[in-house]
Swiss-Prot record:
This is Replication-associated protein ORF4. Belongs to the microviridae Rep protein family. The keyword Iron-sulfur does not apply. GO terms for molecular function: ATP binding; DNA ligase (ATP) activity; endonuclease activity. The keyword Transferase does not apply. It comes from Chlamydia phage 1 (Bacteriophage Chp1). It comes from the Viruses. It catalyses: ATP + (deoxyribonucleotide)n-3'-hydroxyl + 5'-phospho-(deoxyribonucleotide)m = (deoxyribonucleotide)n+m + AMP + diphosphate. Pfam families: REP_ORF2-G2P. Plays an essential role in viral DNA replication. Binds the origin of replication and cleaves the dsDNA replicative form I (RFI) and becomes covalently bound to it via phosphotyrosine bond, generating the dsDNA replicative form II (RFII). In turn, viral DNA replication initiates at the 3'-OH of the cleavage site. After one round of rolling circle synthesis, protein ORF4 is linked to the newly synthesized ssDNA and joins the ends of the displaced strand to generate a circular single-stranded molecule ready to be packed into a virion.
Amino acid sequence: MRYSLDSYLISVYIRLTQRKSDYMCTNPIIPIVQYKVPVKSSLDVVDWSKFRSNFKANLFFFEKNVVRRAVSNVDEAFRFTEQLKQVSYLSTFDLDGYHQVKQFSFPLPCRKCSECLQKRSKDLAVQATMEARSHEENSVLILTYDNDHLGDNILDYDHIRVFQKRLRRYVDYHYGKKIKFLTVGEYGDKKGRMHWHMIVFGWKPKSEEQLEPYLGGKYRTDVRYRSRKLKELWKFGYVDVDEATDGNIFYVARYVQKKFVVGCDLDSSKSSSRREKKTASQALGLDYFFSYLRQFLKTKRIVLNGFRYGFPRYFKDLLRKLVSEDSEFDTEYYNALRKRLLSVCSYSMVNKYFTYLECLVEVLPVLNFHDLYQRALRYMDQSILKPHASDHDGEYNTT
């Protein structure tokens, strides 16, 4: 299903892009951007035909493309040399008697350090919790291997892929439901035996799956359940069934954090075949996100069980993509907004960049974020969120 955004939503999202990042990468990628400025009056426009950018050697190929897109969208914001002089973090040096070279830098997340990995796992946990809110039934399955099928004790993704296919067919045939998964494979802390944790969204085993109670836990005092029917579908060992509480969901979704101990990546000492594996269905939490999108954009946070979380990157990228494709915003005004605010640099550049943009309000009225945000809130009740008619037959109501 594709969704459409109205002018109120995009106006509030513009304010959302100004928020400072919730975390700080410990090993950011810092591109250096340089451009040539003619030495004339302070209000002369920079000759952007001579614009050029230099990157540090630690940039990877795919990250260079991201930086280039970000840099190419800041030209309008840095047009006037008078405002350029007001920014302390811009350095200037004479190139010759007629030109000066100005430069600035901004960090991009490395996506590999513990802070970046923690941010990604938290985003996935928030998405999984939102997906669970969209269903009446959810469950957690623990798939183990018996001694006959343990083999070399190396996780094989094909095992879980085939089981998911069998379970989808089983649930669709007997219950007529569509389900989603979030699965993490890991090795036990004591004996190192491989097993899988799986969250099933939209279904939980019932008496028809032949649930059998047994005593488990550290002291064998906890009542747990195993399913004989799911064991037949799994074929490699036992299948334990548990309730899908928020704690269980966050444990599975944020398991990736267990690999870091005092900033040390424990997976770096493992071969690729021995590393833990994680897989998830597409678009987790999407329906719940769009159902409460107005509320989330108004507070600029996602509130779950009293805790406030930032927007996962998946939702930010989706909103930016919808705005870029929607014909309603194919105007000169919104093209300018997309160019300045909805690009990669909108949420990658440091807070100093946005402080500098506020200095441009008198020169570029379109960048007056406060008035734009207040005007959007006044018309909040008159705006609706609806999908494209070509992609959805029914009415999608968010009220």
